Amino acid sequence: MKINKFFGLAISAALIATTANATTLEDVQHLGFVNCGVSDGLFGFSKADTNGKWTGLDVDVCRAIAAAVLGSAEKVKFTPLTDKERFTALQSGEVDVLVRNTTWTLLRDTALGLNFAGVNYYDGQSFMVRKDLGLKSANELSGAAVCVTTATTTERNLADFFRANAKEYRPVTFESSITAVAAYDAGKCDVYTSDRSALAAWRLTLKEPDVHMILPDVISKEPLGPVVRHGDDQWLDLVRWTLYAMLEAEEQGVNSKNVDQMKESKSPVVRRLLGIEGNMGKHLGVDNGWAYRIIKQVGNYAESFERNVGPNTPLRLQRGVNKLWKDGGLHYPMPFR
């Protein structure tokens, strides 16, 4: 009943927002900034430093949208949102786009009046435990108290996992990841569960990170990506192709350092990507230099990954399935033609 009521309210909010704000691109151009909904502080994805400067993989998508639409990656207002707040904020028009480690699911795509514009990080759910418990697998978690954030796919995946394996557990629920992690660190539960990338990030915030470990089990698929409102296909296209531009740039060997030189490339794909040939920007409602600015000011996907979450960052994440398709991964930009 609670879930049905939630979806009913969500649909109503979405319809109101769509009617009131039919052209997000025009609103953004008029105001001069992109209002981007992000996490309330997840290292590597969206986190502000002590000077208020935001960085992260999700932040880079926001910055890339601003570069494409407004000419500058700096023209972004970052709005931190909890798991519970994020969809309502987008539906109501409080933010223009949600780039907040959000999983693409059937219900979210169909019942909330929202559209997912793509995937900027492929992830999966796992578990973090204290090393001194001596656990090696999630199959040993029977009877465990598990800290989990409500209103997330994580909470539902957790229930599915224990039901499928006929094991008992005690969920300890919280409305924000920050409070859930704090409770786990204080010993109020045996386990904390989330996406593997989030576990790696939250582990760094614990009092003694080295006494905790992430179990190897992956119990779900978590395709994370940017989300926009239903009913504004031009904005959906622009956000989607912003992500594709970063992926295509990596595929074509174009990066922030060589993008000016690559304007001399003979490759038709590179020339279309950089606005030298064709008229791609017109169909998105922007000028033909949109993708050039993304690459010049933000970088290609590989640059963003390495800078924010890669092996040389505290998270030390490997590309894995987040490699390009030609390298054995899942990322596959649609053709620029």
Regions found by a protein language model. Give the residues of each.
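Bilobed "Venus flytrap"/periplasmic-binding protein-like clamshell domains
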Residues: N35-G44, W54-V69, D123-E175, T179
